[in-house]
Amino acid sequence: MIRLLILLLLLNFYSCIEKDIKESNFVGYLVANDSIKIPFDFVFKDSLITISNSKENIKLIRSVDQHDSIKFVSPYFEDYLLFHNHFDSLSGYLHNKSLDRKVKFFALRGENKVVNHENFLLIEGKWKIIFNYDKSESRESEMIISQNKNKIQGTFRTETGDYGFMQGFVGKNKFNLSNFNGYRANLVEAKVYGDTIFGVLYQGNHNVKKFIGFRDDSFNLPDPYAITSMTPGYEKFLFSFRDIEGKIVHNFDKKFLNKVNIIQIMGTWCPNCLDESIYLKSIKEKYKDVVIVSIAFEFAKSKEQAIENLIKLKKNIGIDYDILLAQYGSSDKIDAANKLKSIDTLISYPTLFITDKNLKVRRIHTGFNGPATGEKYTQFKRDFENFLTQLINE
């Protein structure tokens, strides 16, 4: 009788934990190193984790638990969180098997509380950012910030894509921005000296970049339509790869003829590719006669895992056009370019090729700066669809 009572009490205790955790706010942290932790806010509800990144909500879905660990997976990426529940805290790891990557994770019940400083900096606007300014491979970017008192939102635009919706706080002489989308985790910590910024970008536990920034409303990135080129002598984008069902698809198939075509170079591991794929879905719905095909280069170590990743992405976005697997085990751009003889060099995932009805490539768009870039994204969509309409009417 006593044993039964103890068992019932234990079951009731753990069921209370399970019930409570489903409705709770947490602040999560991914450990970049011993002193740096990338924060993100999330909520448990109905077997979902909902991560808040500024204006964006990211869903992670509860999967089959492993022993005494709880598992949450991304609807789009291969990554998953596996952790223990300690009632007021969680502890575990973010895993990506294809990349052999494991990032320590923990979370504390409650909300992210930051002291509201009365003397905070005004940093709203555009900033020219130079990553790795102290190295030979420096790279320019644009930081876009909006501000409400000491709360800030923003992103970084680069010639290959943006860093997603980020949020953070600004104080008397410093600020931070962070996000986590189920795969990519970023943290910016920076100090401000007048119109100059010195900062560091932490990307998970695998990449650190120093940067310097300057206020510059006139700064512009290179034209994304002028970065990638066709191989001399080629006018058409040639390809021949198998789709996720094993059928060979090539550019001279009947369905591509006498149609405007959009060919996307992408990977399921690429957040900017995800944003672009969601946009292309809307294009397909709006322009019924446009033919879209995606060509994937996957990190997954096996063909089976690569196809599984592509099937998951296609299903959860709701894509009804072909996705072809060109490569698995690596997304190396040199190897990729060798499989795509029509292009001189592959600069970025994603890259879009737009052809006319004669299959001639008329434009190449490198990278993707998506919804987090605000007006820049709106302008891109307007220009892209105007050109698409022009090709359709030719």
Residue map of PLM features:
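Bacterial Sec-dependent signal peptides at the C-terminal "C-region" and cleavage site
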Residues: 1, 10-23
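Central antiparallel beta-sheet cores of small beta-barrel/beta-sandwich binding domains
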Residues: 23-85, 118-189
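Surface-exposed beta-loop interaction hotspot
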Residues: 101-133, 224-231, 236-239
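N-proximal helix/coil linker or "cap" segments that precede and/or mark the start of modular domains
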Residues: 202-242, 256-258
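Short active-site neighborhood of thiol/selenol oxidoreductases, capturing the structured segment around
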Residues: 249-274, 278-280, 292-293
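Structural microenvironment flanking redox-active thiols in thiol-disulfide oxidoreductases
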Residues: 275-318, 329-338
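Structural micro-motif
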Residues: 318-322, 339-353
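Thiol-/selenol-based redox modules, centered on thioredoxin-like
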Residues: 348-394
